[in-house]
Amino acid sequence: MELNKYIDHTLLKPTASEKDIIKICNEAKEYHFASVCVNPCNVSLVRKELKGSDVKVCSVISFPFGASSTEVKVEEAKKAIEAGAEEIDMVINVGKLLEGDLEYTQNEVSAITKACHEKNVLLKVIVETCYLEEKNIADICAIIEKAGADFIKTSTGYGSRGASVEDIKLFKKYLKKDTKIKASGGVRTREDAETYIGLGCSRIGASSGIAIVTGK
């Protein structure tokens, strides 16, 4: 199994320096990871560092709390795309989903999907499963499929826990179309990654991508 092609090599710490960003770009090129995932302020640097490689540029949006308005999220996504993002990982407004405001959540996910797809940019929707009950997962799966987003993603890594096997099983239970799954948060070993891929995940978000692919 070519684990490297599943890895979004991730650095989202607020303390990340330019030197740190260049380092993960070099690592991603060496190991041919799927993407480098960073905060929006670092997208242009990542684009420059990855130029000519097979590694995609990925930016998070409204990270880590998803608490920006829909309008701000759309604008942030557009700016990240202008700066060179080829993939967007957007955090939903979890509070709106939990209180049952499905119209708000649908409008938000649909608006970001439209902004991304107009520029042929892939969208991953982060739902922060640590806060969700099964009903919430069923609702957000239906919303994401209706919007036409490309991926559902478990976690930011900043919640009370990261991905779990049960999360992925519930996604598989409620996703009826071709929406892909990204496991993120707490995926640190080769065994972890192989477990999630075996359950049907198409991407793994991790800051420990090298340890995952080398087993060291």
From Swiss-Prot:
Family matches, as Pfam families: DeoC (PF01791)
Gene3D superfamilies per UniProt: Aldolase class I (3.20.20.70)
InterPro entries: Aldolase_TIM, DeoC, DeoC/FbaB/LacD_aldolase, DeoC_typeI
EC numbers for this chain: 4.1.2.4
GO cellular component: cytoplasm
Location of this chain's protein in the cell: Cytoplasm
Entry GO MF terms: deoxyribose-phosphate aldolase activity
GO biological process, any: 2-deoxyribose 1-phosphate catabolic process
Metabolic or biological pathway: Carbohydrate degradation; 2-deoxy-D-ribose 1-phosphate degradation; D-glyceraldehyde 3-phosphate and acetaldehyde from 2-deoxy-alpha-D-ribose 1-phosphate: step 2/2
Active site: 89 (proton donor/acceptor), 153 (schiff-base intermediate with acetaldehyde), 182 (proton donor/acceptor)
Enzyme class: lyase
Catalytic reaction list: 2-deoxy-D-ribose 5-phosphate = D-glyceraldehyde 3-phosphate + acetaldehyde
Main location per the UniProt record: cytoplasm
Keywords from the UniProt entry: Cytoplasm, Lyase, Schiff base
PANTHER family xref list: DEOXYRIBOSE-PHOSPHATE ALDOLASE
Family in the record: Belongs to the DeoC/FbaB aldolase family. DeoC type 1 subfamily.
Annotated function: Catalyzes a reversible aldol reaction between acetaldehyde and D-glyceraldehyde 3-phosphate to generate 2-deoxy-D-ribose 5-phosphate.
HAMAP family: DeoC_type1
Name used for this protein in its record: Deoxyribose-phosphate aldolase
